[in-house]
Amino acid sequence: MTNIYEELEQLVAKAGAGAAVDRLIRELEERRDYTGYFYALVLAKRLELGLPAVQSRFDSHVPAELAEPYEQGIREAARRAGRLALAAQDVGAAWPFFRMIQEPMEVAQVLEKLEPQEPEQCQQLVQIALYEGAHPRRGFQWVLQHYGICNAITTFAQGFPGTQEDRIQCLKLLVRALYDELKARLISDMAQREGVVPPAASSVSELLRGREQSLFADDFAHVDTSHLSSVVQFAYYLPVCEELRLAVELCEYGRHLNSRLQYPGDPPFEQTYHDYLIYFRTLLGAEVEAGLEHFRQKAEQADPAQVGYYPAVVYVGLLERLGRHREAVEAYSRYLALCDPQQLGNCPSIYELCDRLGDYRPLVDIAQRRGSLVDYTAGLIQQMKAKPCRAKAANPVD
């Protein structure tokens, strides 16, 4: 019986290179040798383009006119090798090919439907999905399901690859997980105390109402208070969404804890649950003016030499998130004009604020106070360019 090596040698001699490579590709596909299959497809592309079959490690020169089709051939070879592995549910083998060409979507679609069966498989899938960025939300979901909230909090705090939207999606999962845990434990506690199981649809706020003294007797907490504090602080980065409303309820719960269990935060969130509750409610449109005044006073009273600029950063960011661009620019000019932009965190810079406002005069004024001639000149130029646009907007042609 002819072995594959003899068969390939005969094909090269009698049928030519193309026939031999076609046979090679079929053989490697049957063996599910994904790496070999990929390189065989690349070899086929090299022959198609008239390039040498053997590529020296140090001589990878490809003529300029062939560079694009050769690159496309490599990308298609990676897709085919990756898809072959995905067809066998071998995500670990498929992912390097899709990662190489920066096309995670097909792997993400498979990960969305997968459920780890063994601890080792779970670890591998979390590594690919979360830490290597194939599908961060799904990977974080597995961390919550298989390793628990404590590990999920640590993972979120340490960071992982992905977009800002990926982090927001993971944060939403984290808030919901803690909320659901708290709600389940409240229901269980109340069922034992009262002999009646509260409706499953009850919210945390509804479960607390009228039971504050009994539920929090003896310095009791229904969830790990470090988990509660961490998740509430993370929720600062949420947009207006349902999970932000859940964070409000987490704050309401936290406010009832014994003071020993309420860990103080950094300004302007010294009273963690009280201050974050005001912040979240303001974002959600509840008692907005009172909420803004709360944080304005904290920015006004903060001594940058003692506590830094964070109270002002929070206040300016809150104004901007509420769409109050003019007030945000004015607050920035008052409190952050001399702040190092590197300390702004997620607060918009004066450049961004002026751009959204369509008025660059505040940038000019701040640049002069900072002694920045470049920003001063750039602001003047941009202000001059913005004037015709504003005039045209104010007097549209019929």
Each model region followed by its residue ranges:
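Long, low-complexity, acidic Ser/Pro- and Gly-enriched intrinsically disordered regions
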Residues: 1-99, 105-106, 111-398
